[in-house]
């Protein structure tokens, strides 16, 4: 680590601990080894962060499921899973966010076809899903389609625009892929309720499907909000939370049609 100006470390261990035993412990204490191993990892992390406090350390869920509160003491972010498919990540990130802040969830835009499931998903959808976590890119930018490469600057700009809201806002799970695997949605609301970010993913398109009406959460009921792209259309927080918004297949001229498509809406208080 002293050999160069290293600012970031990904600590990974993609292997299994099998037939674990210790020649220094008696038979009745062999099961201590797992606990002792974790204490040893904590000691290593402590020495690493003490000697190199400027380094951003990212831990990994692999190699013993080290996505735990103890690891967050040493590293502010942890890689959720090597399964980076955007649709698979909906369940992974939904469950992880039940216990851990979104700022801790390692999430990247990865290549397609996805290396885990072989699925192709739109570049935009991959970006919207990764925005829930730390956001980054897990691909070779020189080998992706030119259209996707051209979209990267705007995607990064969009992430930076909403980064603070996602990190510090209240997180609401609007959809639930565990109950209905055809769609998912979530929302981030500023602590002062001045703005809200709503994200929607249509997982599977279905024939003759009616538009969905989705109710937002956490807004100020007596205040009025407008969607960033429609500043002249004012809607009360009460209406957005009780009547909801209409999710149609064709949304404001922008096609929300087919599998794996996504949309974000940014509501701002008047």
Name every feature range the model reports, one short phrase each:
Residues 2, 35-142:
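Glycan-recognition surfaces
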Residues 12, 57, 130, 198, ...:
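Conserved, mostly hydrophobic/aromatic
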Residues 13-16, 60-64, 203:
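Active-site beta-loop-alpha junctions enriched in small/polar residues
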Residues 15-42, 87:
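Aromatic- and acidic-residue-enriched carbohydrate-binding clefts of CAZyme catalytic domains
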Residues 124-175:
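Catalytic cores of secreted or luminal carbohydrate-active enzymes
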Residues 178-220:
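Carbohydrate-binding surface patches
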Residues 204-270:
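C-terminal beta-sandwich/jelly-roll accessory domains of carbohydrate-active enzymes
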């Amino acid at each position: 680590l002293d050999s160069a100006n290293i600012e970031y470390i990904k600590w990974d261990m993609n292997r299994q601990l099998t037939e674990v035993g210790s020649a220094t412990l008696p038979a009745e204490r062999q099961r201590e080894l797992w606990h002792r191993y974790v204490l040893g990892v904590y000691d290593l992390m402590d020495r690493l962060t003490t000697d190199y406090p400027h380094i951003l350390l990212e831990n990994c869920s692999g190699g013993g499921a080290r996505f735990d509160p103890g690891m967050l003491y040493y590293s502010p972010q942890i890689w959720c899973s090597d399964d980076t498919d955007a649709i698979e990540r909906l369940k992974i990130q939904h469950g992880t966010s039940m216990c851990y802040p979104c700022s801790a969830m390692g999430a990247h835009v990865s290549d397609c076809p996805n290396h885990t499931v072989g699925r192709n998903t739109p570049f935009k959808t991959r970006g919207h899903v990764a925005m829930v976590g730390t956001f980054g890119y897990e691909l070779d930018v020189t080998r992706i389609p030119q259209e996707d490469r051209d979209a990267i600057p705007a995607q990064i700009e969009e992430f930076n625009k909403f980064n603070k809201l996602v990190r510090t806002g209240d997180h609401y799970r609007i959809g639930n892929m565990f109950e209905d695997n055809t769609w998912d949605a979530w929302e981030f609301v500023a602590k002062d309720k001045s703005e809200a970010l709503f994200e929607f993913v249509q997982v599977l398109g279905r024939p003759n499907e009616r538009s969905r009406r989705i109710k937002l959460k956490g807004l100020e009921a007596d205040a009025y909000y407008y969607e960033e792209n429609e500043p002249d259309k004012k809607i009360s927080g009460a209406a957005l939370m009780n009547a909801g918004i209409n999710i149609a297949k064709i949304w404001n001229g922008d096609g929300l049609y087919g599998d794996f498509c996504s949309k974000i809406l940014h509501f701002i208080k008047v």
